[in-house]
Regions:
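Donor nucleotide-sugar binding/catalytic pocket of nucleotide-sugar-dependent glycosyltransferases
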Residues: 102-116, 120-138, 156, 160
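A conserved, positively charged/aromatic
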Residues: 87-102
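Active-site donor-binding acidic/aromatic loop of nucleotide-activated sugar
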Residues: 196-200, 215-228
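N-terminal pre-catalytic "stem/leader" segment of glycosyltransferase-like enzymes
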Residues: 1-66
Length: 235
């Protein structure tokens, strides 16, 4: 039994994971950084020295030569699948990706169900980790509200993801549910006299325009750092 455990430890110690960081200054870059910091013994920034490729940003897979992908085991994260946009060209792109991937990773049941209709490869459904040094409860939310500029007695609705299509910067990105968000905001506008909406992230034009049309008070922090984002969650 001891020999078997030693062999397993030795096998794990030989794993060298390379992640294809998108360099977009967004959530996937943060996840990549956290992985590298917490798993230095099995991680590498050198593609050539890796034996496992984690395609954490499949939209940038073309930055890795296909010959390098074929030399190694490939583990690929699919963050979500927008079925309404999954046309002939998207299916063709996925078919090429699927030929190179050994196993997939998803973070939700919905994405797993969609992905199972497209591939026979193994799928691991597991949410992202939480770094509790960055995400934690703040005991005095009233102080945070004052610091940020949120009304002390306000009823807050927060939305921290993009909602607008990049092609025209005005059409709703329906897979993110901005139309449903506006419905909820309008409902609470009639219920709460001190409603205030807090937004972060890029491409919020659709929601912002709807808030202006309906004379709804809002705050917008386009690209926040982790410290401020944690404060917003606590407010």
């Amino acid at each position: 039994m001891r020999k078997k455990q030693d062999k397993n430890i030795e096998k794990i110690s030989k794993v060298k994971v390379f992640l294809n960081t998108p360099n977009e200054n967004w959530i996937v870059d943060r996840l990549t950084d956290e992985w590298m910091i917490n798993n230095p013994e099995i991680s590498t920034v050198n593609l050539k020295s890796s034996n496992l490729l984690w395609i954490i940003s499949p939209w940038t897979i073309n930055s890795i030569p296909e010959k390098e992908l074929k030399k190694r085991k490939v583990f690929c994260t699919i963050h979500h699948i927008d079925e309404e946009k999954f046309n002939f060209f998207e299916k063709k792109k996925f078919k090429r990706l699927d030929a190179l991937v050994d196993q997939y990773h998803v973070i939700s049941d919905q994405t797993e169900n969609s992905l199972r209709q497209l591939t026979e490869k193994p799928i691991w459904n597991n949410p992202w980790w939480i770094d509790q040094s960055k995400w934690f409860k703040i005991k005095d939310p009233s102080r945070i509200r004052k610091e940020i500029g949120i009304q002390s007695e306000a009823f807050i609705i927060g939305s921290f993801q993009r909602d607008t299509e990049g092609k025209d910067l005005k059409s709703p990105k329906l897979s993110k549910g901005p139309d449903r968000l506006i419905e909820m905001i309008l409902y609470y506008k009639n219920q709460q006299s001190k409603l205030q909406v807090v937004l972060t992230g890029k491409r919020r034009q659709y929601v912002i325009n709807k808030l202006k049309e309906n004379n709804i008070n809002y705050l917008y922090f386009e690209m926040t750092d982790i410290n401020l984002l944690n404060k917003l969650y606590n407010s």
